[in-house]
């Protein structure tokens, strides 16, 4: 039995005449022509062929023109059918914000009412204090004072601030506005009085003198407080948990970890919330450096040099200009005086090791001042104080308490 050939022949591609595959973009074509049209129809540079009078399959323009004539259209293109490409972008995992980041406030002031931050601020007038300082500068040092050099004269002037005129010792258990402002005034005037023993200080302009003292009084006070506390421990006036200062005509002793500080006059936050900004704990630099101070036992000459080195270097870096020139010049003179004191009076030519230990104490105080500056920046950002000083130079880098 013979098979009869199929009467129906396969349909041809309407573009190239080859065996067709199916409907593609509106016309029955082969897969090759369908792929060609899919690529060529989206290109702008292909246009009607002007080189061939008859159809040429190898000519892209002719082939594209034949596709259009066969009924193929780019409107039949389908997009975004790729399952991989059609997937949406995977969202990035984000760490959830903390409550502090959400409200924009640090954890230690979260429980405070934000409205209290916008109350009227009180101004502390420093003009009367500056007037007192002007009188001290005009009066000058106690006379007559005869010394071989500047450093020895400063050491003589320091003695009047080391001892209190009265033998009474006052134990301070609470500090409020009255006590804090009293200590502030005493420290500033004592530092001003002491610098009048430096003859070159009198050569500065009056404004420069006051500017210098506004910047360095708290630096002088830090080292002076440390020296008086060390003296108190050696004499048995205070123990290892207390700090002693020479205040007016008497000694004042307090335990920084136990003292009660009333800050309601300068802030609306509680003492617990303000603890970070106050130097009232056993973490204070006084406790950290006290052992080194007791071990070295610097005399008045060495202590005077430490104060000048600490204060003048700080002032030069802060104010620049003529004050910087003055500070560098004085530091050079005082270094020569200290060398002469060690070599000629103490007969100690190899004093480098001892001087390095003294400067180590100064460096520890500088580190503490840097920490205080960072705390002040934080307090300024969050506007925690309700007071302002008429002369802000007084409190830059100074202890809050």
Curated annotation (Swiss-Prot):
The name this protein carries in UniProt is Nuclear hormone receptor family member nhr-65
**Chain segments annotated as transmembrane:** none
Location of this chain's protein in the cell: Nucleus
The similarity comment for this entry is: Belongs to the nuclear hormone receptor family.
Per the record, the domain of life is Eukaryota
State what this protein does. Orphan nuclear receptor.
Task: Write the lineage as a comma-separated list.
Answer: Eukaryota, Metazoa, Ecdysozoa, Nematoda, Chromadorea
Give the record's keywords alphabetically. Answer: DNA-binding, Metal-binding, Nucleus, Receptor, Transcription, Transcription regulation, Zinc, Zinc-finger
The UniProt entry's GO CC annotations, sorted and at most eight, read:
nucleus
Q: Example GO molecular function term?
A: zinc ion binding
Ranges where the NR LBD domain occurs: 132-398
Which PANTHER family does the UniProt record give? NUCLEAR HORMONE RECEPTOR FAMILY, NUCLEAR HORMONE RECEPTOR FAMILY-RELATED
> What coarse category fits the chief subcellular location reported for this protein?
nucleus
Which one Pfam family would you cite for this protein?
Hormone_recep
Q: Which residues bind DNA?
A: 10-79
NR C4-type zinc-finger residues:
13-33, 49-67
* Gene3D superfamilies (UniProt xref): Erythroid Transcription Factor GATA-1, subunit A, Retinoid X Receptor
Tell me the InterPro entries matching this sequence. Answer: C.elegans_Orphan_NR, NHR-like_dom_sf, Nucl_hrmn_rcpt_lig-bd, Znf_hrmn_rcpt, Znf_NHR/GATA
Q: Which SUPFAM superfamilies match?
A: Glucocorticoid receptor-like (DNA-binding domain), Nuclear receptor ligand-binding domain
């Amino acid at each position: 039995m013979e098979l009869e050939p199929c009467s129906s022949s396969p349909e041809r591609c309407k573009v190239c005449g080859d065996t067709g595959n199916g409907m593609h973009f509106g016309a029955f074509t082969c897969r090759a022509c369908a792929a060609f049209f899919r690529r060529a129809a989206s290109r702008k540079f292909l246009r009607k062929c002007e080189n061939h009078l008859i159809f040429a399959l190898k000519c892209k323009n002719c082939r594209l023109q034949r596709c259009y004539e066969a009924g193929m259209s780019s409107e039949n293109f389908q997009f975004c059918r790729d399952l991989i490409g059609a997937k949406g972008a995977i969202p990035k995992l984000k760490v959830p914000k903390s409550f502090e980041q959400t409200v924009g406030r640090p954890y230690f002031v979260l429980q405070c009412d934000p409205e209290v931050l916008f109350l009227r601020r009180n101004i502390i007038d420093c003009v009367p204090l500056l007037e007192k300082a002007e009188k001290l500068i005009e009066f000058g040092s106690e006379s007559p004072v005869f010394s071989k050099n500047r450093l020895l004269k400063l050491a003589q002037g320091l003695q009047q601030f080391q001892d209190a005129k009265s033998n009474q010792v006052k134990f301070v258990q609470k500090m409020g506005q009255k006590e804090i402002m009293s200590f502030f005034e005493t420290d500033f005037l004592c530092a001003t009085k002491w610098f009048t023993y430096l003859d070159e200080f009198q050569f500065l302009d009056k404004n420069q003198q006051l500017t210098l003292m506004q910047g360095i009084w708290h630096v002088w006070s830090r080292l002076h407080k440390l020296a008086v506390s060390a003296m108190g421990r050696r004499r048995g006036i205070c123990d290892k948990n207390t700090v002693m200062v020479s205040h007016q005509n008497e000694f004042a002793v307090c335990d920084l970890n136990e003292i009660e500080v009333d800050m309601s006059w300068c802030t609306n936050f509680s003492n617990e919330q303000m603890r970070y900004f106050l130097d009232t704990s056993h973490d204070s630099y006084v406790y950290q450096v006290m052992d080194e101070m007791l071990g070295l036992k610097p005399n008045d000459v060495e202590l005077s040099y430490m104060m000048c080195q600490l204060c003048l270097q700080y002032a030069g870096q802060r104010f620049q200009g003529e004050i910087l020139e003055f500070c560098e010049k004085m530091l050079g003179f005082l270094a020569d005086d200290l060398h002469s004191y060690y070599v000629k009076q103490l007969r100690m030519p190899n004093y480098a090791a001892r001087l390095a230990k003294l400067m180590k104490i100064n460096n520890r105080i500088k580190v503490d001042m840097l920490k205080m500056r960072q705390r002040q920046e934080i307090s300024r950002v969050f506007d925690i104080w309700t007071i302002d000083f008429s002369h802000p130079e007084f409190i830059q880098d100074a202890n809050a308490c």
